[in-house]
Amino acid sequence: MNEPTRRAFIFGTATVAAAGLLLGVQRILSSAFADSDDPASGPVKIAQFAPAGTPTGFATLPKVRKTPAAWKSQLTPVEYEVTRQAGTERAFTGALDKQYAPGLYRCVDCDNALFDSQTKFDSGTGWPSFYQPIAPENVREKTTVYFGTLLREVKCTLCDAHLGHVFPDGPKPTGLRYCMNSAALHFFPHS
């Protein structure tokens, strides 16, 4: 074997081994940090809100479950990719990033109330950002691993739609930034 071919072989083998090791570590971390409180099926307790944003009480409802085909027929391709496949829309492309009118943000998949415009702020990230959900019962967080980085995924409690992620760099009073995908939300102005 001549020297350039031998180097290419060694480099290629090392690259494949490193990639395999990285994927193995990610798989181990994913299972080690997986949330055990992931409710596979309902019922779940959520807070309900009137169109004007006032709380109307709590309801215990069955989880919304549909086949992939049913979700695809209900959602746009981008909504399906974001909410059902945990995708992320490109920064500054979502319709709700600069929406600051008074209103409610509901799940695009199941209409669950998620965020109130009073908690929305301009994070400069290109995604709608809130410092807290409208009710802690209406969203849930799940630890995920993405290329070796631990993230707190935010999901709809009622239908398990992927909404975005939460980060500890938000404003007062919570210090949190719920970084959401516009494609996961419907905005309803207060009536």
Question: Each predicted region: which residue ranges?
Answer:
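N-terminal secretory signal peptides and thylakoid transit peptides that target proteins
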Residues: 1-20
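A short Gly-Trp-Pro
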Residues: 50, 63-66, 72, 82-106, ...
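C-terminal segment of N-terminal export signals and the immediately downstream linker at the start
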Residues: 23-69, 73
